[in-house]
């Protein structure tokens, strides 16, 4: 599998926020997208996910077969918002996402055990702390398979132990041949990563 961008430009509110971005990632590779606020990191991830239009250039994904014919189909997107319904239990939220996304990988309870929330799977999402909410969103990555993970400040709200736990989750995804593109201000505990510095001439 291969994810690539060539001479990519992105806009926000009709204004160009970045231009000339190119990268290529193969299986088990990670790209860390860094730079100051407003440099276009989140916009880049949303364009790759197919949530925003490409202003110029193109994004290409290959090797996903009929199940994942393009980048949008191949991606899990974890944004600033966790994408959960407060009134539903943690497990019910993950059941919804598993059924909506398809390509089941782990059961909701298995995913919650991995992020350390198995014992409170019955609690409404709205009862959780900020860190627990983020860990639930991370568990969403595990209930349905996607080869590409797009992560926007994924460790926001996590304590040190949860950061280390998430690093193990990411390593497992990479070991299985997955690809990660992460916008972050903080180190993610991964080795051998590529870096794209936004706002540095783009």
UniProtKB/Swiss-Prot annotation:
It is found in: Cell inner membrane. One of its GO terms (cellular component) is plasma membrane. SUPFAM superfamilies: P-loop containing nucleoside triphosphate hydrolases (SSF52540). Its main location: membrane. It is a peripheral membrane protein. Keywords: ATP-binding, Cell inner membrane, Cell membrane, Cytochrome c-type biogenesis, Membrane, Nucleotide-binding, Translocase, Transport. It catalyses: heme b(in) + ATP + H2O = heme b(out) + ADP + phosphate + H(+). Pfam families: ABC_tran. It comes from the Bacteria. The keyword Thylakoid does not apply. ATP binds at residues 35-42. Belongs to the ABC transporter superfamily. CcmA exporter (TC 3.A.1.107) family. NCBIfam families: ccmA (TIGR01189). This is Cytochrome c biogenesis ATP-binding export protein CcmA. It comes from Chelativorans sp. (strain BNC1).
């Amino acid at each position: 599998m291969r994810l690539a961008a060539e001479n990519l430009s992105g806009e926000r509110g009709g204004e160009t926020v970045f231009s000339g971005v190119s990268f290529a990632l193969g299986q088990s590779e990670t790209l860390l997208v860094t730079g100051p606020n407003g440099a276009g990191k989140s916009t880049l991830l949303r364009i790759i996910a197919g949530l925003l239009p490409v202003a110029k250039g193109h994004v290409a994904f290959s090797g996903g077969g009929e199940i994942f014919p393009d980048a949008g189909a191949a991606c899990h997107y974890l944004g600033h918002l966790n994408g959960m319904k407060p009134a539903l239990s943690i497990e019910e939220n993950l059941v919804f996402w598993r059924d909506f996304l398809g390509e089941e990988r782990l059961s909701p309870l298995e995913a919650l055990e991995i992020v350390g929330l198995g014992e409170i799977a019955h609690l409404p999402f709205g009862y959780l702390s900020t860190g627990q909410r983020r860990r639930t969103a991370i568990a969403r990555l595990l209930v349905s398979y996607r080869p590409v993970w797009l992560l926007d400040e994924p460790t926001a709200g996590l304590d040190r132990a949860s950061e280390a736990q998430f690093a193990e989750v990411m390593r497992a995804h990479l070991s299985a041949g997955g690809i990660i593109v992460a916008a972050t201000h903080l180190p993610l505990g991964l080795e051998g990563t590529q870096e794209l510095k936004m706002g540095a001439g783009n």
